[in-house]
Amino acid sequence: MTKLIQKGEDSIQLQLWDTAGAERYNSMGSSFYRNSEACILVFDLTSPESFKNVEIWRNEFLTTLNPPDKSTYPFILFGNKSDLPDIKVKNEDIQAYCQEHNNMPYFSTSAKDGINLEEGFNKVADMAYNRNTKSEESFIPDTKFLKITQEEPKKKGCCG
């Protein structure tokens, strides 16, 4: 799925790849992840096992993409299927995970009903936009000024 989000005069293209945690997509990861500026991790709120896999998926993503600073790479977490009554993943566990990972933003979503998807997509677009803006700024070299003074030649003489 591709979604275009407008940020001022800039357009941000979100490309969403639903691999459903399938191992068969692991070998294709590098082509999926190349040039990405942020990552949405999605788990099933009705499956504690799915939530446990979030850390595995996050680590695989970071290993494959190999960004310069893994600790600050922007992730966002979606807990999907919030429309279902049998939610089994505890909010406390989700909050703890997000706090452990740089206060990762979290959205309880429903792909079926469209709950919180727009808000989540806008948040990840903001994160990618801010990351891209900061990385462009980092290419501007710092300007340093050096004061050059010329020493007065010493006078030679008998009293000098």
Regions found by a protein language model. Give the residues of each.
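Inter-motif core of Ras-like GTPase G domains
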Residues: Y25-P48, V54, T64
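Conserved P-loop small GTPase signature centered on TRAFAC-class small GTPases
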Residues: L4-S11, T63-G160
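Switch I (G2) and immediately adjacent beta-strands of P-loop GTPase domains
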Residues: M1-M28, R34
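Generic recognition of short, well-ordered alpha-helical segments
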Residues: S27-S31, K52-I56, K88-E92, E119-G120
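The beta1-alpha1 cofactor-binding region of Rossmann-like NAD(H)/NADP(H)-dependent oxidoreductases
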Residues: T19-A22, S47-P48, G114
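Conserved beta-strand segments of the P-loop GTPase G domain that flank and frequently precede/overlap
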Residues: L16-W17, I40-D44, L77-N80, S108-T109
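Conserved Walker B
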Residues: A20, L45-T46, F61, S82
